[in-house]
Amino acid sequence: MDSIMEPYVADLLADDITASMVELLPGDGGAAQMDVGVLDAYLRAIGALPAHPAAPGADLAAAAEVESMASNDDTNGVLYDWDTKVDVKVPCALLPPPPGFPPLPVPGLADEPVYAAPARHLPPPPGFPPLPVPGLADEPVYAAPARRLPPPPGFPPLPVPAKAEPVYAAPVDEGDAIRAFMQQLEWSEQYNGDNDAPAPDNSTASRPQLCAPYDDDIDANLRDMEKDAAQRPSPDYLDTVQGGQISAAARASLVAWMGRLTHRYELAAGTLHRAVSYFDRFLSVRALPSYTAHQLSLVAATAVYTAAKYEDQGTVFKLDAREIASYGEFASAQEVLAMEREMMAALGYRLGGPNAETFVEHFTRYSKGKEELRVQRLACHVADRSLESYGCLGYLPSMVAAAAISIARWTLNPPGALPWSSELQELTGYSSQDISSCILTVLNTQ
């Protein structure tokens, strides 16, 4: 080794830089005292000589050295790199195993945690049969009615009750229902004509002072007003005055729109009936300049506006022309006011005529009790729906009200009540035969 190193040592000592470092080496600083092994390691460290080949088992030694330098987090696979001064994540499975130990398996699907598998999927212990695969039989027993469980030993099985179909599930033909109603109405006429028939609970005998003197005057006044031709619309004005430009379906749509307007501003109950009366009476005497949706809506909205003024005592919100113009998307409030002046002139300033809602309240003014009040409310609703029927213009408002009351009684069918009674005939002045055709007209609009 000395013979090999001597030429290199001589060259290095001749170099000025190396000569200045001789004093840093162990010994007296002379070449004779220099440790050749130390110099060899130094030369190989600075790259002057090639590195020694790796000895057998060097990997294990390097791994042991790295493991010895690991930080406190080496149990989590985090090692400390002394060169970069940072922690390096090294999976423990990638480190070489100690001598005499097999290498660790690479993690895969088979190494997933066992908690993800239900216990019944694990193999059974030795000597035990495997658990059955879950299915319908493993559903909780509370989902099955008790009658489906097997009976105890010695007891016969419980009989399964027959499935009862609900009554409302069967569809009812409207024609059959109307025919049944008319038959019951005819039967009530025969029943009321029987002199031996007992008087119902709501008969005139149970109501003292039913026909007081002022009641007769009020009734006579209402009857005269409803027959006044100046306060009634023409039953065929769509053809005779408007020339067929407005259909019955278009009129029904406008009436429904007027109903939404009255509900939007919570107007009084009689506002809609009075507004529809103004609408029909105006179109019965004035042909429109145009039949656009804007023009028809303007007439309908103005009728509601005028009726709301008449029924202002029962109105929550006071309407003005600006509200009507905003709801109907008209040009301005002046357009509504101009139509109002034209409508008032066409109506002859006669705004207080009776309508069907007026007569429903008049005929049921003595109603008392829960069932009779229900009949009264439903009769008012039926009268509201009858406004959409163009055919109802051919009947007096009192007859439409009587038909609505009969339909309400038949629909609710209170105990002991018939579609028509002798008391109702006395109050309204109509027999069941008188209102039969009006009932059919009203039912066709429901």
Curated annotation (Swiss-Prot):
Keywords: Cell cycle, Cell division, Cyclin. InterPro entries: Cyclin (IPR039361), Cyclin-like_dom (IPR013763), Cyclin-like_sf (IPR036915), Cyclin_C-dom (IPR004367), Cyclin_N (IPR006671), Cyclins_cyclin-box (IPR048258). One of its GO terms (cellular component) is cytoplasm. GO terms for biological process: cell division; G1/S transition of mitotic cell cycle. The keyword Phosphoprotein does not apply. One of its GO terms (molecular function) is cyclin-dependent protein serine/threonine kinase regulator activity. PROSITE patterns: CYCLINS. Belongs to the cyclin family. Cyclin F subfamily. PANTHER family: CYCLINS. This is Cyclin-F2-2. It comes from Oryza sativa subsp. japonica. The lineage of its organism: Eukaryota, Viridiplantae, Streptophyta, Embryophyta, Tracheophyta.
